[in-house]
Amino acid sequence: MKILLVSTQDYIHHPIPSRHHNIFEELATRHEVHVPHFHVSRGKERETRLHVHEATRFPVESPFLHYTANAPHHYRVIREIIRDYDIDIVVGAHVLAGTAMIRAAKRFNVPVVFDLKDWFPDSAAAYYKNPAVKRLIREGVLAITRYNLDHSDVITTVSPGLVEKLRGYGYEAELITNGVNTDLFRPLDGGAMRTALGIAPDAFVLGFAGAVERWYALDEVIRALPEIRKRHPNAELLIVGGSLFTGYLEELQALAADLGVAGRVHFTGAVDYRDLPGYIAPMDLCLIPLSPPQWVDIALPNKYFEYSACGKPILSTPIPDMLRMGGDQIAVYRNREEFIKRVDDLALTPGRCPTGMEEHSWKKKAEAFEKIFMRLTGKR
Protein backbone atom coordinates (compact mmCIF):
# COMPACT_ATOMS: atom_id res chain seq x y z
CA MET A 1 0.00 0.00 0.00
CA LYS A 2 1.18 3.55 -0.77
CA ILE A 3 0.49 5.93 2.10
CA LEU A 4 0.93 9.69 2.41
CA LEU A 5 1.36 11.01 5.96
CA VAL A 6 0.92 14.73 6.68
CA SER A 7 2.24 15.06 10.22
CA THR A 8 1.65 17.85 12.72
CA GLN A 9 5.39 18.34 13.14
CA ASP A 10 8.69 18.77 11.36
CA TYR A 11 8.97 15.04 10.80
CA ILE A 12 12.76 14.75 10.69
CA HIS A 13 13.89 17.58 13.01
CA HIS A 14 11.35 17.77 15.85
CA PRO A 15 13.14 16.73 19.06
CA ILE A 16 10.29 14.57 20.40
CA PRO A 17 8.87 11.75 18.24
CA SER A 18 5.10 11.99 17.99
CA ARG A 19 2.59 9.19 17.67
CA HIS A 20 2.97 9.53 13.90
CA HIS A 21 6.70 8.82 14.08
CA ASN A 22 6.15 5.68 16.10
CA ILE A 23 3.21 4.35 14.11
CA PHE A 24 4.34 5.16 10.58
CA GLU A 25 7.93 4.02 11.03
CA GLU A 26 6.39 0.65 11.90
CA LEU A 27 4.03 0.76 8.91
CA ALA A 28 6.97 1.64 6.65
CA THR A 29 8.45 -1.80 7.32
CA ARG A 30 5.73 -3.27 5.08
CA HIS A 31 4.24 -0.32 3.13
CA GLU A 32 5.56 2.59 1.07
CA VAL A 33 5.05 5.70 3.21
CA HIS A 34 5.69 9.28 2.04
CA VAL A 35 5.84 12.43 4.17
CA PRO A 36 6.24 16.14 3.28
CA HIS A 37 8.93 17.90 5.31
CA PHE A 38 7.88 21.11 7.07
CA HIS A 39 11.23 22.57 8.14
CA VAL A 40 10.06 24.48 11.21
CA SER A 41 12.36 22.87 13.82
CA ARG A 42 16.13 23.07 14.11
CA GLY A 43 16.88 19.82 15.91
CA LYS A 44 19.19 17.04 14.84
CA GLU A 45 17.93 15.20 11.76
CA ARG A 46 16.59 11.76 12.64
CA GLU A 47 16.79 8.65 10.51
CA THR A 48 13.56 7.49 8.92
CA ARG A 49 12.17 4.69 6.78
CA LEU A 50 9.75 7.12 5.13
CA HIS A 51 10.22 8.82 1.77
CA VAL A 52 10.74 12.49 2.68
CA HIS A 53 9.72 15.29 0.28
CA GLU A 54 10.88 18.85 1.00
CA ALA A 55 7.83 21.10 1.33
CA THR A 56 9.37 24.30 2.69
CA ARG A 57 9.90 27.39 0.56
CA PHE A 58 10.20 29.87 3.45
CA PRO A 59 12.09 28.32 6.42
CA VAL A 60 10.48 30.48 9.11
CA GLU A 61 10.74 29.13 12.68
CA SER A 62 7.49 30.59 14.03
CA PRO A 63 4.90 27.82 13.46
CA PHE A 64 2.10 30.28 12.69
CA LEU A 65 4.14 32.23 10.14
CA HIS A 66 5.75 29.08 8.73
CA TYR A 67 2.53 27.27 7.91
CA THR A 68 0.77 30.41 6.71
CA ALA A 69 3.58 31.55 4.38
CA ASN A 70 4.16 28.06 3.01
CA ALA A 71 0.51 27.00 2.63
CA PRO A 72 0.32 27.35 -1.20
CA HIS A 73 3.61 25.47 -1.61
CA HIS A 74 2.42 22.74 0.77
CA TYR A 75 -0.61 22.17 -1.43
CA ARG A 76 1.51 21.86 -4.57
CA VAL A 77 3.95 19.42 -2.96
CA ILE A 78 1.18 17.26 -1.46
CA ARG A 79 -0.71 17.24 -4.77
CA GLU A 80 2.43 16.16 -6.65
CA ILE A 81 3.18 13.35 -4.19
CA ILE A 82 -0.35 11.97 -4.54
CA ARG A 83 -0.20 12.20 -8.34
CA ASP A 84 3.37 11.08 -9.00
CA TYR A 85 3.50 8.20 -6.51
CA ASP A 86 -0.02 6.87 -7.05
CA ILE A 87 -0.92 7.24 -3.38
CA ASP A 88 -3.67 4.91 -2.10
CA ILE A 89 -4.57 6.69 1.12
CA VAL A 90 -3.77 9.97 2.85
CA VAL A 91 -3.60 10.30 6.63
CA GLY A 92 -2.71 13.37 8.61
CA ALA A 93 -3.32 15.72 11.47
CA HIS A 94 -2.66 19.34 10.70
CA VAL A 95 -4.53 22.61 10.51
CA LEU A 96 -3.54 24.50 7.33
CA ALA A 97 -1.54 21.64 5.81
CA GLY A 98 -4.49 19.40 6.68
CA THR A 99 -6.69 21.50 4.43
CA ALA A 100 -4.11 21.28 1.64
CA MET A 101 -3.95 17.52 2.16
CA ILE A 102 -7.72 17.11 1.93
CA ARG A 103 -8.13 19.28 -1.17
CA ALA A 104 -5.31 17.51 -2.98
CA ALA A 105 -6.61 14.06 -2.01
CA LYS A 106 -10.16 14.84 -3.13
CA ARG A 107 -8.83 16.02 -6.49
CA PHE A 108 -7.55 12.48 -7.11
CA ASN A 109 -10.38 10.65 -5.28
CA VAL A 110 -8.01 9.35 -2.61
CA PRO A 111 -9.58 8.57 0.80
CA VAL A 112 -8.53 10.67 3.80
CA VAL A 113 -8.07 9.65 7.44
CA PHE A 114 -7.84 12.64 9.78
CA ASP A 115 -6.00 11.67 12.97
CA LEU A 116 -6.85 14.31 15.56
CA LYS A 117 -4.14 13.86 18.17
CA ASP A 118 -5.29 16.76 20.35
CA TRP A 119 -7.88 19.54 20.23
CA PHE A 120 -6.15 21.91 17.83
CA PRO A 121 -8.08 25.10 18.72
CA ASP A 122 -6.80 24.93 22.30
CA SER A 123 -3.32 23.58 21.58
CA ALA A 124 -2.67 26.28 18.96
CA ALA A 125 -3.81 29.03 21.33
CA ALA A 126 -1.68 27.69 24.20
CA TYR A 127 1.49 29.32 22.84
CA TYR A 128 0.05 32.83 23.29
CA LYS A 129 -0.52 34.86 26.47
CA ASN A 130 -2.62 37.78 25.18
CA PRO A 131 -6.33 36.89 25.72
CA ALA A 132 -7.46 38.60 22.50
CA VAL A 133 -4.82 36.78 20.45
CA LYS A 134 -5.68 33.47 22.13
CA ARG A 135 -9.36 33.94 21.29
CA LEU A 136 -8.61 34.89 17.68
CA ILE A 137 -6.32 31.88 17.20
CA ARG A 138 -8.79 29.51 18.85
CA GLU A 139 -11.74 30.62 16.72
CA GLY A 140 -9.75 30.59 13.49
CA VAL A 141 -8.28 27.16 14.11
CA LEU A 142 -11.70 25.79 15.10
CA ALA A 143 -13.17 26.89 11.76
CA ILE A 144 -10.35 25.28 9.79
CA THR A 145 -10.44 22.11 11.89
CA ARG A 146 -14.17 21.72 11.29
CA TYR A 147 -13.63 22.09 7.55
CA ASN A 148 -10.98 19.37 7.67
CA LEU A 149 -13.16 17.01 9.70
CA ASP A 150 -16.18 17.65 7.45
CA HIS A 151 -14.20 16.53 4.40
CA SER A 152 -12.45 13.46 5.84
CA ASP A 153 -13.60 9.88 5.22
CA VAL A 154 -12.61 8.60 8.68
CA ILE A 155 -11.66 10.46 11.85
CA THR A 156 -9.39 8.83 14.41
CA THR A 157 -8.35 10.24 17.75
CA VAL A 158 -6.32 9.49 20.86
CA SER A 159 -8.62 9.43 23.89
CA PRO A 160 -12.20 8.58 24.90
CA GLY A 161 -12.59 12.17 26.07
CA LEU A 162 -11.72 13.51 22.63
CA VAL A 163 -14.13 11.02 21.05
CA GLU A 164 -16.86 12.52 23.24
CA LYS A 165 -15.78 16.10 22.49
CA LEU A 166 -15.97 15.40 18.76
CA ARG A 167 -19.38 13.80 19.19
CA GLY A 168 -20.53 17.06 20.76
CA TYR A 169 -19.56 18.80 17.51
CA GLY A 170 -21.42 16.19 15.45
CA TYR A 171 -18.49 13.93 14.47
CA GLU A 172 -17.97 10.21 15.04
CA ALA A 173 -14.35 9.18 15.60
CA GLU A 174 -12.57 5.86 15.96
CA LEU A 175 -10.36 5.52 19.04
CA ILE A 176 -6.68 4.61 18.66
CA THR A 177 -4.91 5.67 21.84
CA ASN A 178 -1.27 6.61 22.09
CA GLY A 179 1.17 3.87 22.97
CA VAL A 180 4.75 3.04 23.82
CA ASN A 181 7.78 1.32 22.35
CA THR A 182 7.89 -1.66 24.71
CA ASP A 183 11.26 -2.73 23.33
CA LEU A 184 12.76 0.62 24.37
CA PHE A 185 10.80 1.62 27.48
CA ARG A 186 11.33 -0.96 30.23
CA PRO A 187 12.58 -1.02 33.83
CA LEU A 188 16.28 -0.09 34.04
CA ASP A 189 18.74 0.47 36.87
CA GLY A 190 19.19 4.21 37.44
CA GLY A 191 22.42 4.16 39.42
CA ALA A 192 24.77 5.10 36.60
CA MET A 193 22.53 7.95 35.44
CA ARG A 194 22.31 9.32 38.98
CA THR A 195 26.08 9.45 39.08
CA ALA A 196 26.24 11.12 35.65
CA LEU A 197 23.71 13.78 36.71
CA GLY A 198 25.24 14.42 40.13
CA ILE A 199 22.29 12.96 42.04
CA ALA A 200 23.05 11.18 45.31
CA PRO A 201 22.36 7.41 45.46
CA ASP A 202 19.95 7.90 48.38
CA ALA A 203 18.08 10.89 46.90
CA PHE A 204 14.32 10.68 46.45
CA VAL A 205 13.93 11.86 42.86
CA LEU A 206 10.77 13.44 41.51
CA GLY A 207 10.98 13.42 37.74
CA PHE A 208 9.38 14.78 34.59
CA ALA A 209 10.24 13.82 31.01
CA GLY A 210 8.82 15.61 27.98
CA ALA A 211 8.27 18.99 26.39
CA VAL A 212 8.96 21.75 28.91
CA GLU A 213 6.03 24.00 28.06
CA ARG A 214 3.43 25.88 30.08
CA TRP A 215 0.71 23.28 29.70
CA TYR A 216 2.73 21.30 32.28
CA ALA A 217 2.72 23.28 35.54
CA LEU A 218 6.34 22.60 36.41
CA ASP A 219 6.58 26.03 38.01
CA GLU A 220 4.12 24.83 40.66
CA VAL A 221 6.22 21.70 41.20
CA ILE A 222 9.32 23.85 41.78
CA ARG A 223 7.39 26.14 44.14
CA ALA A 224 6.44 23.09 46.22
CA LEU A 225 10.00 21.77 46.42
CA PRO A 226 11.21 23.89 49.39
CA GLU A 227 8.34 22.58 51.54
CA ILE A 228 8.93 19.01 50.36
CA ARG A 229 12.60 19.30 51.26
CA LYS A 230 11.70 20.39 54.80
CA ARG A 231 10.06 16.99 55.22
CA HIS A 232 12.43 15.02 52.99
CA PRO A 233 15.85 16.71 52.79
CA ASN A 234 16.98 14.12 50.24
CA ALA A 235 14.28 15.14 47.71
CA GLU A 236 15.47 16.36 44.31
CA LEU A 237 13.74 17.21 41.03
CA LEU A 238 14.86 15.97 37.61
CA ILE A 239 13.38 17.71 34.54
CA VAL A 240 14.26 15.98 31.27
CA GLY A 241 13.47 17.85 28.07
CA GLY A 242 13.58 21.27 26.47
CA SER A 243 11.13 23.98 25.49
CA LEU A 244 9.81 23.84 21.93
CA PHE A 245 8.83 27.43 21.09
CA THR A 246 8.90 29.42 24.34
CA GLY A 247 11.30 30.48 27.09
CA TYR A 248 9.56 28.40 29.78
CA LEU A 249 12.69 26.36 30.57
CA GLU A 250 14.70 29.51 31.34
CA GLU A 251 11.83 30.79 33.50
CA LEU A 252 11.91 27.57 35.52
CA GLN A 253 15.67 27.79 35.99
CA ALA A 254 15.32 31.36 37.26
CA LEU A 255 12.47 30.33 39.58
CA ALA A 256 14.55 27.51 41.10
CA ALA A 257 17.37 29.99 41.74
CA ASP A 258 15.00 32.53 43.32
CA LEU A 259 13.63 29.85 45.67
CA GLY A 260 17.08 28.66 46.66
CA VAL A 261 16.68 25.14 45.24
CA ALA A 262 18.71 25.48 42.04
CA GLY A 263 21.19 22.91 43.33
CA ARG A 264 18.38 20.39 43.81
CA VAL A 265 16.68 20.84 40.44
CA HIS A 266 18.44 19.12 37.57
CA PHE A 267 17.66 20.30 34.03
CA THR A 268 19.03 18.08 31.27
CA GLY A 269 17.66 20.03 28.31
CA ALA A 270 16.54 18.08 25.26
CA VAL A 271 17.88 14.52 25.07
CA ASP A 272 17.80 11.93 22.32
CA TYR A 273 14.50 10.08 22.48
CA ARG A 274 16.18 6.68 22.48
CA ASP A 275 18.06 7.73 25.63
CA LEU A 276 14.88 8.75 27.46
CA PRO A 277 14.34 5.45 29.36
CA GLY A 278 17.81 5.87 30.85
CA TYR A 279 16.82 9.30 32.17
CA ILE A 280 13.53 7.96 33.57
CA ALA A 281 15.41 5.17 35.36
CA PRO A 282 16.67 7.28 38.33
CA MET A 283 13.22 8.75 39.00
CA ASP A 284 11.42 7.45 42.09
CA LEU A 285 8.19 9.26 41.30
CA CYS A 286 7.20 10.41 37.79
CA LEU A 287 5.08 13.53 37.33
CA ILE A 288 2.32 14.52 34.90
CA PRO A 289 1.39 18.06 36.06
CA LEU A 290 -0.97 18.76 33.15
CA SER A 291 -2.45 22.19 33.73
CA PRO A 292 -5.00 23.62 31.24
CA PRO A 293 -8.51 22.54 32.35
CA GLN A 294 -9.71 22.50 28.74
CA TRP A 295 -7.12 19.78 27.99
CA VAL A 296 -7.51 17.57 31.04
CA ASP A 297 -10.83 16.05 29.94
CA ILE A 298 -9.46 14.97 26.54
CA ALA A 299 -5.88 14.05 27.40
CA LEU A 300 -4.20 10.66 27.51
CA PRO A 301 -0.50 11.60 27.56
CA ASN A 302 2.31 9.53 26.14
CA LYS A 303 3.99 9.96 29.51
CA TYR A 304 1.46 7.65 31.12
CA PHE A 305 2.47 4.83 28.78
CA GLU A 306 6.21 5.54 28.96
CA TYR A 307 6.41 5.91 32.73
CA SER A 308 4.25 2.79 33.20
CA ALA A 309 6.35 0.71 30.81
CA CYS A 310 9.41 1.70 32.89
CA GLY A 311 7.69 0.41 36.04
CA LYS A 312 7.39 3.81 37.71
CA PRO A 313 4.75 5.20 40.09
CA ILE A 314 2.98 8.28 38.71
CA LEU A 315 1.74 11.43 40.42
CA SER A 316 -0.61 13.40 38.18
CA THR A 317 -3.28 16.03 38.05
CA PRO A 318 -6.69 14.35 37.53
CA ILE A 319 -6.82 13.10 33.93
CA PRO A 320 -10.07 11.12 33.59
CA ASP A 321 -9.10 8.92 30.64
CA MET A 322 -5.81 7.97 32.28
CA LEU A 323 -7.61 7.09 35.50
CA ARG A 324 -10.13 4.98 33.57
CA MET A 325 -7.27 2.91 32.20
CA GLY A 326 -6.45 2.14 35.81
CA GLY A 327 -3.33 1.07 37.56
CA ASP A 328 -2.31 1.11 41.20
CA GLN A 329 0.76 3.13 40.19
CA ILE A 330 -1.28 6.34 39.73
CA ALA A 331 -1.78 8.90 42.49
CA VAL A 332 -3.67 12.16 41.94
CA TYR A 333 -3.38 15.72 43.27
CA ARG A 334 -5.49 18.82 42.65
CA ASN A 335 -3.51 21.60 44.32
CA ARG A 336 -0.15 22.30 45.91
CA GLU A 337 -1.19 21.02 49.33
CA GLU A 338 -2.34 17.69 47.88
CA PHE A 339 0.82 17.49 45.80
CA ILE A 340 3.01 17.84 48.90
CA LYS A 341 0.87 15.31 50.81
CA ARG A 342 1.05 12.73 47.98
CA VAL A 343 4.81 13.17 47.68
CA ASP A 344 5.08 12.78 51.46
CA ASP A 345 3.13 9.50 51.33
CA LEU A 346 4.96 8.10 48.31
CA ALA A 347 8.41 9.07 49.60
CA LEU A 348 7.83 6.74 52.53
CA THR A 349 6.82 3.79 50.34
CA PRO A 350 8.84 3.98 47.11
CA GLY A 351 8.86 0.97 44.83
CA ARG A 352 8.62 -0.41 41.35
CA CYS A 353 5.23 -0.98 39.74
CA PRO A 354 4.13 -3.67 37.28
CA THR A 355 4.47 -2.62 33.64
CA GLY A 356 1.76 -4.42 31.62
CA MET A 357 1.95 -2.15 28.56
CA GLU A 358 2.31 -4.81 25.86
CA GLU A 359 -1.25 -4.29 24.60
CA HIS A 360 -0.42 -0.61 24.10
CA SER A 361 2.70 -1.11 22.00
CA TRP A 362 3.10 1.10 18.94
CA LYS A 363 3.08 -2.07 16.84
CA LYS A 364 -0.50 -2.71 17.98
CA LYS A 365 -1.45 0.88 17.14
CA ALA A 366 0.07 0.54 13.67
CA GLU A 367 -2.04 -2.58 13.10
CA ALA A 368 -5.18 -0.65 14.08
CA PHE A 369 -4.45 2.03 11.47
CA GLU A 370 -3.62 -0.64 8.92
CA LYS A 371 -7.08 -2.19 9.34
CA ILE A 372 -8.72 1.18 8.65
CA PHE A 373 -6.56 1.73 5.56
CA MET A 374 -7.44 -1.72 4.20
CA ARG A 375 -11.13 -1.10 4.85
CA LEU A 376 -11.06 2.17 2.90
CA THR A 377 -8.89 1.03 0.00
CA GLY A 378 -9.56 -2.69 -0.28
CA LYS A 379 -5.79 -3.19 -0.41
CA ARG A 380 -3.41 -4.97 1.94
Residue map of PLM features:
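Carbohydrate-associated surface elements
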Residues: 161, 179
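A short helix/loop element that forms part of the nucleotide-sugar donor recognition site in Leloir-type
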Residues: 186-199
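N-terminal subdomain of nucleotide-sugar transferases
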Residues: 1-44, 85, 228, 319
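Conserved acidic donor-binding segment of nucleotide-sugar-dependent glycosyltransferases
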Residues: 328-337, 343-348
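Membrane-proximal helix-turn-helix segments that form the acceptor-binding/catalytic region
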Residues: 22-23, 76-80, 99, 103-107, ...
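Nucleotide-activated donor-binding/catalytic signature segment of Leloir-type glycosyltransferases, i.e.
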Residues: 240-241, 249-275
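Nucleotide-sugar-dependent
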Residues: 14, 216, 272-279, 286-308, ...
